[in-house]
UniProtKB/Swiss-Prot annotation:
It is a multi-pass membrane protein. The keyword Transmembrane applies. It comes from Homo sapiens. Keywords: Membrane, Repeat, Transmembrane, Transmembrane helix. The chain crosses the membrane at residues 37-57, 160-180, 190-210, 221-241, 250-270, 281-301, 305-325. One of its GO terms (cellular component) is membrane. This is Solute carrier family 35 member G4. Belongs to the SLC35G solute transporter family.
Length: 338
């Protein structure tokens, strides 16, 4: 046919062709969240919210069976050990590459110190306040350390959300610090706040060390080492510092199992998020743990939630909204395949 000959398919030079327009794209193709936004959402939904259950469940296990904090650390670490099977199946070394093995073990040690301080603090301090102090210190330390060590700056909106979250935490924990009782009870409560602060410091250092590790199986290796280091340090300490106690009822066993699963999920999500977004922003989004802990403190533990706690939780949620909205930047797919 004549119409199929290449000669007849040439464009007509006397009539200029209309300007080419890119084909219409679906909404999910035109606008997609950035990596930082994905990381923050993972930290919010998979890191902060599950972690909010850990404090109340730990307190319930302690109240039901007088389960010491070291046993909770041991039970949590046991959930990390099966990750060794995944590393073996992939053919990866259990302790990480030899050249950065020391840094990997140090990161695992910081994670163990973080969870140990957290579990010890919630036994003498209200769960919401303990989570508040820990997240407060982790956010401030992450912002300072990242700025000094990595020279990674934050935008004005990020600083606004960061400072707002810190303000909310001060509103929550401030009245409790001014009303510490004198005597032994006040000393134990003060030590609980100190442990919560040290736990946040260990968390921020652990996140920075984790960001410096670059090998394919980084996350499962650090998770396994956290369990291994935790067991090596907690099992001897349990027999020296405390008397081993077995959970006495089904409620205690359920709380221990839930703590192990939820903390492993939170650990994995935070490890992913910190490779995508600024550590200080990840810690700020993790303040959702505080809000969840306050809710569970009232409904599960039947502990009083002061008006300042509610006000501070509202400020924290508003700050998280600012940070998340700032990072919800739509990336247009400007390239059209020809």
């Amino acid at each position: 046919m004549a119409g199929s000959h290449p000669y007849f398919n040439l464009p007509d030079s006397t009539h200029p062709s209309p300007p080419s327009t890119p084909p219409s794209l679906h909404w999910h193709q035109r606008c997609q969240p950035s990596d930082a936004t994905n990381g923050l959402l993972v930290a919010l939904l998979g890191g902060g919210l599950p972690a909010g259950f850990v404090g109340p469940l730990s307190r319930m296990a302690y109240q039901a069976s007088n389960l010491p904090s070291l046993e909770l650390v041991i039970c949590r670490c046991l959930f990390h050990l099966p990750i060794a099977l995944l590393l073996k199946l992939r053919g990866d070394p259990l302790l990480g590459p030899p050249d950065i093995r020391g840094r990997t073990c140090f990161c695992a040690l910081l994670n163990v110190l973080n969870i140990g301080c957290a579990y010890s603090a919630v036994q003498v301090v209200p769960t919401g306040n303990a989570a508040t102090v820990r997240k407060h210190s982790s956010t401030v330390c992450s912002a300072i350390l990242t700025l000094c060590l990595e020279s990674q700056v934050l935008s004005g909106y990020d600083w606004c959300g960061l400072l707002g979250s810190i303000l909310g935490l001060i509103i929550i924990v401030g009245p409790g610090l001014w009303t510490l009782q004198e005597g032994t009870t006040g000393v134990y409560t003060g030590l609980g706040y100190v442990q919560a602060f040290l736990g946040g410091l260990a968390l921020s250092l652990g996140l920075l060390v984790y960001r410096s590790l670059h090998f394919p199986s980084c996350l499962p290796t650090v998770a396994f080492l956290s369990g291994l280091v935790g067991l090596l340090g907690s099992v001897p300490g349990l027999f020296v510092l405390q008397s081993p106690v077995l959970p006495s009822d089904l409620l205690s066993w359920s709380c221990v199992g839930a703590v192990g699963i939820l903390t492993l999920v939170s650990f994995t999500c935070v490890g992913y998020a910190v490779t995508k977004a600024h550590p200080a922003l990840v810690c700020a989004v993790l303040h959702s743990e505080v809000v969840m802990a306050l809710i569970l403190q009232y409904f599960m533990l039947h502990e009083t939630v002061a008006p300042s706690d509610i006000m501070g939780a509202g400020v924290v949620l508003g700050s998280i909204a600012i940070i998340t909205a700032r990072n919800l930047i739509c990336e247009r797919t400007g390239k059209v395949e020809e």
